[in-house]
């Protein structure tokens, strides 16, 4: 059984990014170990199952894999599953950590045959490190410089065959040469409420929590299509159920706990409402540029683009147009406001 501290929620309970190393440890404990245990992403799972099966039959390293999509959808989990299904070791790092070519060279030269190297935030690799990676991906070789000044010389080192699994939330920031070296490219999509309910039920069992189907579904509906958020909400609702109820998570208990956390029925929290209200009230529904919007709500541009916007756009509350962000009719309805006339909104989204 996995224990959690009472009411130790992160500042933004529906953030899709891990709040601390301790939360990452909880995630690892709840993480499915095999592809058959992995819920959702049916298309990606089906593709990986075939590609891994073929690579195992040929006793080869799996082709290099690029996983992209919003945070919290299971990219790291899939990297661990790939290594386990292939029966090999996994080495994990991230783009910002690999500051010098020697950092990457040390990782690559220590890989055993067919091992998996997982690089999270791969779009943040420095250009000089990325250059070292190209021959490693294509030919399983790296060039390193020995010595300094006029006496320096390049030495080519052979590597064991390996699989690079790269993960990113910003696929558009990858350079074309790097993107082209991945043989398998998969986009992870937001999960349905039914898929998330299955994940919540499974996680509750691992946590030793009692939950009924309607309780699972209530949490799932407010989890913004993201397993990481669903598991975080589950832990907070479990705390509430133990203190305010008999420990069983019902729909009513889940609703009360999530209301306490200020997560509404469509999964919006204060930050989501702040963003939408800024578009509606400060900028007349839009269009508004992302930099102006970031200044208006006191957030970083990257936070808006990577964390806040994807769910709002996917759910149809916000549009991204060439002229800026525009609130949709659904956003007006959510706040009980009258929508603008069709002619006015048509001018705003001209060119879409």
Swiss-Prot record:
Keywords (A to Z) from UniProt: ATP-binding, Cytoplasm, DNA damage, DNA recombination, DNA repair, DNA-binding, Hydrolase, Nucleotide-binding
Q: What is its EC number?
A: 3.6.4.-
Spans annotated as Small ATPAse domain (RuvB-S): 192-262
* Subcellular locations according to the entry: Cytoplasm
Q: Where does ATP bind?
A: 30-31, 72, 75-77, 138-140, 181, 191, 228
The GO cellular component terms are: cytoplasm; Holliday junction resolvase complex
In residue numbers, the region (Head domain (RuvB-H)) covers: 265-352
Nucleotidyltransferase keyword on record: no
**Residue sites binding Mg(2+) per the record:** 76
Q: Which InterPro entries match?
A: AAA+_ATPase, AAA_lid_4, DNA_helicase_Holl-junc_RuvB, P-loop_NTPase, RuvB-like_N, RuvB_C, WH-like_DNA-bd_sf, WH_DNA-bd_sf
Which annotated residues bind DNA?
301, 320, 325
| Pfam families, alphabetized | AAA_lid_4, RuvB_C, RuvB_N
Reactions catalysed: ATP + H2O = ADP + phosphate + H(+)
| Coiled-coil blocks | none
GO MF annotations, alphabetized? ATP binding; ATP hydrolysis activity; four-way junction DNA binding; four-way junction helicase activity
Q: Relay the domain remarks.
A: Has 3 domains, the large (RuvB-L) and small ATPase (RuvB-S) domains and the C-terminal head (RuvB-H) domain. The head domain binds DNA, while the ATPase domains jointly bind ATP, ADP or are empty depending on the state of the subunit in the translocation cycle. During a single DNA translocation step the structure of each domain remains the same, but their relative positions change.
- Summarize the protein's role: The RuvA-RuvB-RuvC complex processes Holliday junction (HJ) DNA during genetic recombination and DNA repair, while the RuvA-RuvB complex plays an important role in the rescue of blocked DNA replication forks via replication fork reversal (RFR). RuvA specifically binds to HJ cruciform DNA, conferring on it an open structure. The RuvB hexamer acts as an ATP-dependent pump, pulling dsDNA into and through the RuvAB complex. RuvB forms 2 homohexamers on either side of HJ DNA bound by 1 or 2 RuvA tetramers; 4 subunits per hexamer contact DNA at a time.
Q: What is this protein called?
A: Holliday junction branch migration complex subunit RuvB
């Amino acid at each position: 059984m996995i224990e959690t501290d009472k009411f130790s929620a992160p500042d933004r309970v529906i953030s899709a990014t891990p709040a601390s190393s301790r939360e990452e440890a909880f995630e690892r404990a709840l993480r499915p170990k095999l592809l058959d245990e992995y819920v959702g992403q049916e298309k990606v799972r089906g593709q990986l199952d075939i590609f891994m099966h073929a690579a195992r039959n040929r006793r080869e390293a799996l082709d290099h894999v690029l996983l992209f999509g919003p945070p919290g959808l299971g990219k790291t989990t899939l990297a661990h599953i790939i290594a386990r299904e292939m029966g090999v070791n996994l080495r994990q790092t991230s783009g910002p950590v690999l500051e010098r070519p020697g950092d990457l060279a040390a990782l690559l030269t220590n890989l055993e045959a067919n091992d998996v190297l997982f690089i999270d935030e791969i779009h943040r690799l420095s250009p000089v490190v990325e250059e070292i990676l190209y021959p490693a991906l294509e030919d399983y070789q790296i060039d390193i410089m020995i010595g300094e000044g006029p006496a320096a010389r390049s030495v080519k080192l052979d590597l064991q065959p390996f699989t690079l699994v790269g993960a990113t939330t910003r696929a558009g920031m990858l350079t074309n040469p790097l993107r082209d070296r991945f043989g398998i490219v998969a986009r992870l999509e937001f999960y349905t409420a039914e898929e998330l309910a299955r994940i919540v039920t499974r996680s509750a069992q691992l946590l030793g929590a009692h939950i009924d189907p309607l309780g699972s579904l209530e949490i799932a509906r407010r989890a913004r299509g993201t397993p990481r958020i669903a598991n975080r909400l589950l832990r907070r609702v479990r705390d509430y159920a133990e203190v305010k109820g008999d420990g069983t998570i019902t729909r009513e208990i889940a609703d009360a706990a999530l209301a306490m956390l200020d997560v509404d029925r469509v999964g919006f929290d204060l930050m989501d409402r702040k963003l939408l209200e800024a578009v509606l009230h400060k900028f007349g529904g839009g269009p508004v540029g992302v930099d102006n919007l970031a200044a208006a709500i006191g957030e970083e541009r990257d936070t808006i683009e990577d964390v806040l916007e994807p769910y709002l756009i996917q759910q149809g509350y916000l549009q991204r147009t060439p002229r800026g962000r525009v609130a949709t009719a659904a956003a007006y309805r959510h706040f009980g406001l009258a929508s603008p006339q069709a002619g006015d909104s048509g001018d705003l989204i001209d060119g879409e």
